[in-house]
């Protein structure tokens, strides 16, 4: 007798007639007039529960089995047999059922109902992984993360752990969470009456990171190919389906790479991870296609088999101006493309994923390489049908004088970035990278509309529960 995951039973990795033990939670119990009960037991290892067939001859049948309800935890031992019923190949003929934990009051159990609104589930985020939806999201999230690590490992990249606490603003937007141990009731002041951060824990004003990119560049300029993958933070007061205050970012950086290399890497990476999730999470993707977004599987299959289009920002604006469509947000050269513009390009004009590149310098960050025209930078956004921007990246500015000039234009103090500037002083190289918002990737794969539902415990304005 061995303990096995439910997935091994349902996917035929356990021999028929072998005695096994599965451990999990009751999804449903059904009783027949013939004195047999059917328990659907899940353990999270796959989408479907396994059916345990329990005869009333078991010694605890009347006292315990007949009182099991949704959410109770059980340990079921029995023989794996071919299932005569529709919908599953194998089931367990139980010889022993142990109750590990009861649900105190089945009538008030928050997960008792079969269907819950997505808004309600956010209020019980500690219990929502027990639902079909959030359980499937969690498994897909895991598979995507593992596929990303696998892809970069196979490509010769090194994973670098960049700090979560920083004194630098990568984006230059100032939307950062301050980190401080100062006494809010008795703040130290300097001669100008401002808060004296010299007295703070780090001896300077410090923040939660908005990106690992700048730190990542330092390692790319020594190890050649690296990536970072971890949480990032934006103190942006946005209550939308696309924004979180805490989210995960994947950021590769490659030395001796230009913008074209960057675009090729992004395309290869996305196709790799989409192929992985289609192959490894077929049961979960089937659920998303049936219950969440009927195009979920077909969308990824199209993506994997379609070459990316490329277009310069200037040409993209011309396409939008000539298309005859009325947009909510006006289109003109110099505007940052909105989601509706991005989706028109990907879904209606190119009908494919598209890389928009060479944006006006005024709407992009200081570290992006200035093009020869002096007006645009070597930036790129990857736009995907169905969502719009999924990746943002650029070739980085490797020329110290140009970098300093861009910092001055944007009102940044170059002394705050002395270590970043050192990379341009000691053996500078062209290099490129991009950022992928992990939650937006998961939303795209699953068809789940709100990024709050693809991260275990969402952090949003006025919400840091659990």
From Swiss-Prot:
InterPro entries, per database record: Aa-tRNA-synt_II, aa-tRNA-synth_II, aa-tRNA-synth_II/BPL/LPL, Asn-tRNA-ligase, Asp/Asn-tRNA-synth_IIb, NA-bd_OB-fold, NA-bd_OB_tRNA
GO biological process terms, semicolon-separated: asparaginyl-tRNA aminoacylation
- Coiled-coil region(s) at which residues? none
Q: Which SUPFAM superfamilies match?
A: Class II aaRS and biotin synthetases, Nucleic acid-binding proteins
Going by the UniProt record, its keywords in alphabetical order are:
Aminoacyl-tRNA synthetase, ATP-binding, Cytoplasm, Ligase, Nucleotide-binding, Protein biosynthesis
Q: Where in the cell is it found?
A: Cytoplasm
Q: Which GO terms describe its molecular function?
A: asparagine-tRNA ligase activity; ATP binding; nucleic acid binding
Q: What Pfam families does this protein map onto?
A: tRNA-synt_2, tRNA_anti-codon
Q: Tell me what reaction this enzyme catalyses.
A: tRNA(Asn) + L-asparagine + ATP = L-asparaginyl-tRNA(Asn) + AMP + diphosphate + H(+)
A cellular-component GO term for this protein: cytoplasm
The EC code for this enzyme is 6.1.1.22
Principal location = cytoplasm
Q: Does the keyword ATP-binding apply?
A: yes
Summarize subunit and interaction data from the UniProt record for this chain: Homodimer.
Known PANTHER family for this protein?
ASPARAGINE--TRNA LIGASE, MITOCHONDRIAL-RELATED (PTHR22594:SF34), ASPARTYL/LYSYL-TRNA SYNTHETASE (PTHR22594)
Family per UniProt? Belongs to the class-II aminoacyl-tRNA synthetase family.
Instruction: Please identify the protein, giving its name as recorded.
Output: Asparagine--tRNA ligase
Gene of this entry: asnS
